[in-house]
Amino acid sequence: MKELLINNTIGSFLIGILAFILLCIIMLPTILRWLGLHPHYESKDYNLEDNKALIITTSHDTLGEGGKATGVYSSEMTIPYYEFSDARIIVDLASIQGGKIPVEPRSLKWPLTTAADKRALKDTDFQNKLNNSIKIDEINIAEYDLIYMAGGWGAAYDLGQSQVLGQKISKAYAEDKIIGSVCHGALGFLQAVNENGDNLVKGKQMTAVTDKQINELGITETPLHPETELRKAGAKFESETAFKDIFANHVTRDGNIVTGQNQNSSGETANLMMKLLSDKK
């Protein structure tokens, strides 16, 4: 009898442990959101019909020479895409080389995937744009009211190095377009200049993924680190911090330029861009 009681107690204890582990697994996305990863952002209800937005991404798909697969961080593309399209904005996808946009595989895996990512996977129109993105050389930037640059590790290899992208961003700025970026997407500003030929970011309040977050994630082999490069170019870099910067969040605006710190900033960045556009009308 005593042995049976002990066995029942052990069994109940093990069941309790398993139930606790299962609950933690189920609740992990919610816990991460509570800590600051992909926080819920209450979108404004805009109707910006007859306006156009361009989302620009990387075309680079590997970390280093023959390293792990990478690309654009999915939510940094999908969240702004649906924020814009739900406001009745026509949205195009472009990339440095055109064609199929590489997506960071880890950004589509549990528990990092978002509702916008899941929506995009089922959206045939989005998937067609993703697989047939417009080459940046072929873009007529004058057609767009909003220009947004998504991040991801791949962006460290081609956004900041593209003179063509720099020319497009320079022209967009000169034409009073609203330009935004999140995370590594801010590297797309590096080749852009103002009307005097100075670095466009010089003296501007900007944010992007921090050196601290890059070091914490241990992916330091990428050629350009946004915080370092923006500071070198003369930007007034600002950011928030957390016990791990992957849980931090910050969005800043300087005139028509809106920048978000990391993947947590996508919704707020897109909404602030739309607010600026709405205020122009």
Segments (PLM) and residue ranges:
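Extended, subdomain-level signal for the structured scaffold at the beginning of enzyme domains
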Residues: 2-175, 187-281
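Short, thiol/selenol-centered motifs that function as redox-active sites or metal-ligating centers
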Residues: 181-186
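Active-site cofactor/cluster-binding pocket
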Residues: 178
